[in-house]
């Protein structure tokens, strides 16, 4: 490996030339130590019934060295800026004074151009002032993931950090420091930990990573400071042990039936919108054989914030879809306040984002954001008839499948460096009837797989199927195998997804300008995943469903990261195994040739044993499926 790949920086978005003018430069005195700025973006490919709000603002994290309190911005109180609707939300209210020697983090999300790129503002405290320019970053952290080497270990002891450097020169890293609270209940005041030496470079116009083994970390909030040859880079986020979980949605009604649990287990479902369900969570033998993590309110905290429960909780989620709110959107500040009790706990919060048109104003509210969007015969925030990718009129029953990727990338970038998750459309029994010429009210197997892969290829760290109720599964039995295959593949590639980061994306069109392929890549320290997702699908007029055309010749070109530019193995992978592919190196790129349709996923490694580890995990997934045989007659009997 080159010297810049062993140790690389950690940060959230931050202008590489941030010039913070303060009246207290001594690092031990009151001062503004750093700023993380995440400019708002929109997914321009999305279409809506009414014109979207064009306002682009930014989200901020201010890192303040104490002693300091009584903060104002441009002479105004934070609540005044919220009331004036210049901000979407903030967390200045009820925050304690920052004591001497400690670090306090204050966050807010702008809602007007006044707080967008090209502006500046003055931060005032009782002990210092600082002028902060709002600039687009040249270098930023795109992901921070905390992992545990032992699956049974509650606290993570490994940190994966990726930083993208779009500057024209390398970024030199000198060290890393964590700032941690003295207790989980004191999460708002952070204290410095010893600096970890990390001399390295992030190449210009490229990505680098840092893979650190550390002592077990507390499940609380932390600031990360990276010392560089310029300013320190900063981020603030919750430390949570990351695992790739697969949810079945609202499955609690039938969890007392082993036949249903066998089916869910064979589909690799390990999470659900449950908390305590009679006949399941209070049945120790059943709960042990069919472990399903809870994804719910998880109150009272004194019961659920325990070592016994932590391993059985995916995340806290109870806000529904606040951007929709049942017709009354829930203001972002209300969402922030609803999650406040959990911030002094070890439980990570999650919120459902449902409308890209406005979700930038909700960015940063939870520890583990996710979104829901379904592309066929389902309620939707976007205007399906407005998409012009079709040769004829756009259907009312479906939207471009590839917009799932657009939505995933939007949510990911607005909330980085936190990991994100996605709901993906599965069989559903609740939407019935004849809809604009389409009788089938759930995705067909191809539509189901394509939507899931567009999210996965943009690097999510959990997938939630909507909705694997017993009724829906029995009604659409042809979805079982594609769900099972996606789950098997996810188990096999899980280490690369969790330890990785999104690297590149290209939307490719034909010479005539028609949709062709979406090309996406995810890199990790030991491997790279390449996704070629077919966007040349057509409408089957006989049934009004999307169909992929027969395999066609294709050539895919992917850029390799610096540490994987001499690969030893490149194979096509799927739920059945790994097959040789026709590939060649071309400078910093790999070129793959073949005949493909639907999707093609490739694994690139420098060490051949990584391929064998992939195949071993695939075998583990098959063994799990075999351990939970499905009894169709028993399932049908449950609904008689």
Task: Indicate where each model-derived feature is located.
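N-terminal secretory signal peptides that target proteins for export/translocation
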Residues: 1-4
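Intrinsically disordered, low-complexity Pro/Gly/Ser/Thr-rich segments with frequent PxxP/GP/PP motifs
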Residues: 77-112, 182-217, 590-599
